[in-house]
C-alpha cells in the first residue's frame, strides 16, 4: 500500500505439514511452517527511512541448540525473528550516505527439562552498516563498513568487521 511518501506492506505464509502423524518418525514429525513480514517506508526529498519486522518458524520439532553452537536458518528447531531499520540521505546529486541496523534473534525450542531450563537457547545476531557513495562524471567512489556481532547465531564467534572502498572509472 502506497500513499504519497509512505509505503506499507505485509506478507504471510503458512505451509501445512501433510505427513501422516500416525506413521511419522520423531525426526519427520514436524509442525506447520510459517513466515511473516511487515514493513514501512517513508521518503521525503533526499531522506528515506524504512523499518521491517519478520518471523520464521520452519516447523522443526528438534530441540533447541545452545546459543554458543550456531544455528542454520530453516533447519534449527525454534524460530527466528528479525527487526531492521535503514536510513538513507542524498546530500546532493553526487553524494549519498546510509545506515542500516539489523537484529536477528534465534529463539530456541528447548526440551522441557531442568537441564534445558539452565541453558540459554536465545541469541541475537546484530548487524550495523554504514555506506557512502560519491560520483562525479565517469568516476565513482563507494565505501562501507559493516560489523556483525554473533555471526551465524553463535554467541562464541568473534565480531566480524568488513570495510571496503571501491573506485570505478568509466571510459
PLM regions: where:
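Outer-membrane beta-barrel proteins
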Residues: 1-171
Amino acid at each position: 500500500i502506497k500513499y504519497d511518501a509512505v509505503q506499507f506492506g505485509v506478507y504471510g505464509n503458512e505451509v501445512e505439514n501433510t505427513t501422516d502423524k500416525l506413521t511419522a518418525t520423531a525426526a519427520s514429525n514436524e509442525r506447520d511452517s510459517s513466515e511473516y513480514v511487515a514493513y514501512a517506508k517513508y521518503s521525503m526529498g533526499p531522506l528515506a527511512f524504512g523499518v521491517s519486522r519478520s518471523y520464521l518458524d520452519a516447523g522443526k520439532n528438534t530441540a533447541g541448540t545452545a546459543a554458543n553452537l550456531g544455528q542454520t536458518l530453516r533447519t534449527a528447531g525454534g524460530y527466528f525473528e528479525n527487526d531492521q531499520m535503514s536510513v538513507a540521505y542524498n546530500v546532493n546529486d553526487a553524494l549519498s550516505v546510509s545506515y542500516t541496523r539489523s537484529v536477528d534473534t534465534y529463539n530456541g525450542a528447548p526440551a522441557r527439562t531442568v537441564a534445558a531450563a539452565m541453558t540459554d537457547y536465545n541469541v541475537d545476531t546484530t548487524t550495523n552498516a554504514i555506506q557512502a557513495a560519491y560520483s562525479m562524471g565517469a568516476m565513482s567512489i563507494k565505501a562501507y563498513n559493516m560489523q556483525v556481532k554473533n555471526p551465524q547465531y553463535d554467541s562464541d564467534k568473534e565480531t566480524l568487521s568488513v570495510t571496503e572502498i571501491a573506485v570505478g572509472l568509466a571510459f
